[in-house]
Amino acid sequence: TLLIECTLMEGTNARRGEMEPVSRHLANYMIDKDMNSYCTFISNNLHSTVISDFRMRLNFPWYRSDTEGIDGMRILPLHTTELKTVLEKNIKYSQLYSLFMKACDSDIKVPPQWYDECIKNEINNV
């Protein structure tokens, strides 16, 4: 299941205002409905720290209570420019899913480089 979270906050405000709710929404959905769910976080301003924080969620546990938690979650940041490209190119969900899962599996550690190579360039090259 794909969850979509959007914000109009900018810069580190997006990090402070969205990091916890986006993670909580996805984690709760995973625990309650579908452990294979993932999320795209759409913003008109993706600060490197926001990209980094969501990228790190892949490998860090999250706990709803002392007895309920998950080992990690897939939250993929997406700039509105790339969303526009997805819509203009009429990129199908199956293509997007494949692209997103490939991005999750990437070994690139530097957040802006990871985003540019695994999300932005891949969407532009579909």
Where in the sequence are the language-model features?
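Catalytic core segments in nucleotide and nucleic-acid processing enzymes
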Residues: T1-I123
